[in-house]
Amino acid sequence: MLVSIEWLYNNLKDVKVVEIDYNPQISYYEGHIPGAVLINWRDFLSDNSRDFASPEKLSKVLGNAGINNDDLIVLYSDMNNRYAFYAYWILKAYGHSNLAILNGGIYKWLRENYPIDNDAVVVRRSEYKASKPDWSSRILVWELLSRLKEIVLIDSRSKEEYDGLTTAPPEHKCEQTQMSGHIPGAKNVPWTTLLNDDETMKSRDELGRIFSWLNREDRIVVYCRTGARASVVWYALKEVLGFRLVRLYDGSWVEYGNMVGVPVEKSISDHS
């Protein structure tokens, strides 16, 4: 669920607030919501392979953050709150269903002049037990390639990335891939079109209009560059609009754009 700034302020003592950061040095340590603990988004990843953490590692990460299995976790993040949605998708797969996202994130909190804290939170370690992940909401590239004609693909990157003008957004300009363009058949729905100017998610009615071209029985796959932006689209479709068959291709363009022999489409010519 999405919770408002006001709701969180009135319930700070009853929830576990977690800031999921891409770059903690310029976000969490410059000011965070009082009581919020920090988790670097990379802590959700495996130490030995390009995959997600084992249940044992995730248990340690959440336990070190003082989180218990029955806690209501309220997530927010830097980078326009996108990593809060990504963490929601991951934590739900590992069996933590008592989750919420702060609608509008830290930027709306700051704009509305709610208090912030600059000190790291002293955490009392807990004994968290993560479940074996249920990856029914995930699709790997091998299945994706075998089902291209059966699925509805949504590319949630910017139009420039989708068209093939660039392989990464400005904030990640050093992280390029070998190919530009998009997966054949994908429709471009930039993730930012789902947000209001204050970075809150648009209403259910507005989201319904954006995705009015979809059918309820469509098998939908969303992707972006690394999975974070696509998780916002996944959340809107699955958790807000109630589409049942929505999966996230978290390998996204950093995997697909570097693969040999896979089909790629561009909206522009390489010689234009």
Regions found by a protein language model. Name each.
Residues 224:
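Short cysteine clusters
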Residues 1-27, 103-178, 264-272:
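Flexible, polar/low-complexity N-terminal or interdomain linker segments that lie immediately upstream
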Residues 53-148, 165-166, 181, 229-252:
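Thiolate-centered catalytic microenvironments shared by cysteine-dependent enzyme domains
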Residues 43-73, 187-220:
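Helix-loop module immediately N-terminal to the HCX5R catalytic loop
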Residues 244-272:
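Extended hydrophobic/aromatic segments used for targeting, binding, or gating
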Residues 153, 157-210:
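A mid-sequence, solvent-exposed acidic-amphipathic segment
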Residues 39-41:
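N-terminal, Lys/Arg-enriched amphipathic/low-complexity engagement segments
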